[in-house]
Amino acid sequence: MDLGTEIKSDTRQEEQRHVFEDYPEPLRYTTWVLRVSIHCEGCKRKIKKILSKIDGVYTTNIDVKQQKVTVIGNVEPEILIKKIMKAGRHAELWPTSMENNINNDCNYQKKPKKDNEETSGDEDDDENNNNNNGGGDVGGGGGGGGGNFDQVKQVVTFVNGQLQPQGDGAPKKKKKKKKKKKSLGNTTVVMEGGGGGGGGGGPPQNDGPPETVIYSAPQDHHIIHGPPPHLHHHQQQNHPYPTVHSPPRHHPQQMYGPGPGLPPPSFYHTQPQTAPSYTVSYNTVHGPINNGGNETASYYTAPPSHPTSYYSYEYVDTGYESPPPEFYSYRSQPSESFESLSEGNPNSCCVM
């Protein structure tokens, strides 16, 4: 009997060893953060009591200052919000760190685009500046090419009411101020003006400020200075087109060389025969002749059939014969203009 009972007890013990105990599954807790309107300690106790009665809530933590409620448990956040809303309190999910990270990523993606646009705009500005600097260098080089000799510049101003330089075609108007440089041999002429300049076919125009003519010569060239330009302007206003009492003695566009022992006029200068030059004159002057024993002279010529200009380019050839003495003789003119232009020299030029 004893043996049988012992065998049974051993088998039972072995069965108990092979039986595995069933352990419960671990709870999956999650943390939810809610924003709840909490005004006082009474609201805090009421919300904590409501949340503790919900199945699956393990712990609750309430921060009154931030109105922040932290719930740890195995429950969905929608259930928590519904329970709190039924109690008459507003509740919503607190923005989590994941959402903040997503927003930060979006902002980070927007910033590089703006930075790229700014950098591209800066590069365009740099390229434009480089192009402008390059153009200035080229222009400076072009200006340096003409500096073979020192230039002596002389400025003469005349009013646009006078006739303009000759030309073929209809009159032209300049809308903007422009500068023109014309190099004639060793002489450089610069014309500035804002009014209407035109060819010989148009009437004189009174639009715009006075025009300025700058012409230069080599440093060793002698320039004779005459009365200031404003005196010439005053004289031309008083006597725009006087009458002519004598026929011309030479062609209007031809000028004589310097006479023996006499100084050349201010608008005239000589050049070597191998390199003829061009000069600028503003009027056509004729010497006096005898008409019936009365010696008369006209300082200006009447406008011919084709319009002429007080501003013209003259060709000078030293091979021509010298003019007669009457060309350099004293010319009678109105007392007012003579007194304003003489300055002790009866043969002084009215322009230079």
UniProtKB/Swiss-Prot annotation:
Residue limits of the HMA domain? 29-92
Record flagged with keyword Metal-binding = yes
| UniProt xrefs under CDD domains | HMA
Q: Which GO terms describe its molecular function?
A: metal ion binding
User: Where is lipid attached as S-farnesyl cysteine?
Assistant: C349
Record field: compositional bias (Gly residues): 133-148, 192-203
Q: Where is the composition biased (Basic residues)?
A: 172-183
Acidic residues: bias regions: 118-128
Q: Which UniProt keywords apply?
A: Lipoprotein, Metal-binding, Methylation, Prenylation
List ligand-binding residues for a metal cation. Answer: C40, C43
Q: Which residues carry this modification: Cysteine methyl ester?
A: C349
| Family affiliation | Belongs to the HIPP family.
| Function comment | Heavy-metal-binding protein.
The identity of this protein, by name, is: Heavy metal-associated isoprenylated plant protein 36
